């Protein structure tokens, strides 16, 4: 019998639907609006969230019906995760796809959905809804913290 947790013993393709869904740590970073530079293809995160992101829970407020309200919402699938370069470096889907383990604060490891927030990984308290800004000003909200959350601080900074 295998005593390893499923994320250590299965590939993304082998996971059941409930296992797949549980890989989401609830950080909300994938629900931030992003800008793509046309000539280079570079992706830039903004602090502007999808109108459906609940800023406190960092979960979609209409997950099952999100495409009714946000037709271009990107669904993470076993097939497309390897090709989505903008997934944050702490994303459970990205980590498992890269053969890495989940961090201590991931709810599957900690047993507590609040640890992702307590560890400062999530978007909680850092965003503004797209309904509250002029979308023409989106570039004014470019941030790098979604790509640096979870990085070890230098001793001088700590």
Swiss-Prot record:
Signal peptide: none annotated. Transmembrane segments: none annotated. Belongs to the UPF0260 family. This is UPF0260 protein RHECIAT_CH0001358.
């Amino acid at each position: 019998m295998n005593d390893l947790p499923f994320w250590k013993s299965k590939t993304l393709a082998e996971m059941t639907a409930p296992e797949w869904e549980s890989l989401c740590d609830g950080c909300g970073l994938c629900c931030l609006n992003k800008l793509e530079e046309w000539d280079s293809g570079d992706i830039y995160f903004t602090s502007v969230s999808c109108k459906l992101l609940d800023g406190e829970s960092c979960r979609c407020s209409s997950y099952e019906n999100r495409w009714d309200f946000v037709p271009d919402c990107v669904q993470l699938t076993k097939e497309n995760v390897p090709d989505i370069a903008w997934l944050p470096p702490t994303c459970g889907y990205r980590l498992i796809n890269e053969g890495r383990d989940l961090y201590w604060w991931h709810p599957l490891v900690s047993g507590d959905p609040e640890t992702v927030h307590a560890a400062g990984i999530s978007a909680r308290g850092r965003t503004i809804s797209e309904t509250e800004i002029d979308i023409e000003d989106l570039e004014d909200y470019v941030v790098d913290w979604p790509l640096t959350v979870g990085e070890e601080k230098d001793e001088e900074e700590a």
